[in-house]
Regions:
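A generic structural signal for short beta-strands and their flanking turns/coil linkers
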Residues: 42, 66, 84-88, 112-116, ...
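C-terminal edge-of-domain segments
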Residues: 1-18, 124, 128-243
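Short, structured beta-strand-loop surface elements
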Residues: 3-4, 8, 74-135
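A structural signal for short, well-ordered beta-strand segments and their strand-loop junctions
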Residues: 45-47, 91, 163-165
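Short N-terminal helix-initiation segments at or just after the protein's N-terminus
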Residues: 4-10, 32-35, 53-67, 99-113, ...
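A structural signal for short, well-ordered beta-strand segments
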Residues: 61, 118-120, 162, 166
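An N-terminal domain-cap segment
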Residues: 14-69, 80
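A generic structural motif
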Residues: 68-72, 162-163
Length: 243
């Protein structure tokens, strides 16, 4: 028999890089959970260092398989340096609730988050860049790339698309109610509660220069006012890329 078991393809191997240390039972390493947290988000934060100084850039992103993609201005310092094969850490956080406890120590937040690690690189193939730019639009608005004009040469030149293979990652979640010290429930007369937090889609405000006769495209049918943003992004992701 082999000395070690083969790596589980459905999980990220736990290492010193991705190990969840604080409240480790909240850690998640299975790819299904990590992918779900990523696919429900619109914005990520990309952390990196340039000449020993730390930076963290918020940007829209999306996932295709085990790769993450984002875009930026070709003149951006962040993009220029990421283009050199810079190690990066990509994070996503969803805030699901604010938790009021009977001590400051136990006040908390319900959340879902991901830390993903890899090396950023620029997409240089023109056809691949165009494909990804369409996917960037369709990831949020399914089918929209077929309804709008394609980017012109100046826009292509001004935009850099970055990609990163997820080399390793971990997720973390808190999804419970108030959790106080047992003696505090009876001894501390402080009102305690959990406030759910959600982002929702509102009513659309149409462009004042809309051409006459245009109606909302079929691909926007899921954009119902009051729909949770994270749930909507999961739906639009699956419509564009599948389950």
């Amino acid at each position: 028999m082999p000395d070690t078991l083969p790596a589980d393809p459905d999980r990220f191997e736990v290492s010193e890089v991705n190990r969840v240390r604080r409240v480790h039972d909240r850690g998640r390493y299975d790819k299904a959970t990590i992918h779900a947290f990523l696919d429900a988000a619109v914005v990520c934060h990309i952390a990196y260092t340039i000449d020993g100084r730390p930076y963290c850039t918020p940007t829209a992103f999306w996932r295709e398989g085990e790769h993450l993609y984002w875009h930026g201005s070709s003149a951006s310092r962040a993009i220029r340096n990421q283009n050199k094969g810079l190690p990066v850490c990509v994070t996503v956080t969803h805030v699901d609730a604010l938790v009021m406890a009977r001590s400051g120590f136990h006040h908390s937040i319900n959340y879902r988050c991901v830390m993903a690690f890899g090396t950023a690189h620029a997409i240089t193939d023109r056809a691949e860049k165009l494909r990804l730019m369409d996917n960037f639009v369709d990831r949020i608005y399914p089918g929209r790339s077929k309804l709008i004009r394609q980017p012109n040469e100046q826009e292509l030149k001004a935009t850099t698309l970055m990609g990163m293979e997820i080399e390793t990652a971990s997720g973390k979640i808190r999804d419970k109610h108030v959790a106080d010290e047992e003696e505090d429930y009876a001894a501390v007369p402080a009102w305690s509660a959990l406030y759910p937090v959600t982002q929702v889609i509102g009513e659309p405000s149409e462009c004042a220069r809309q051409l006459p006769g245009l109606t909302r495209p079929e691909g926007m049918a899921d954009f119902v006012p009051g729909t949770r943003l994270d749930e909507l992004m999961t739906v639009t992701y699956r419509k564009t890329f599948g389950a």
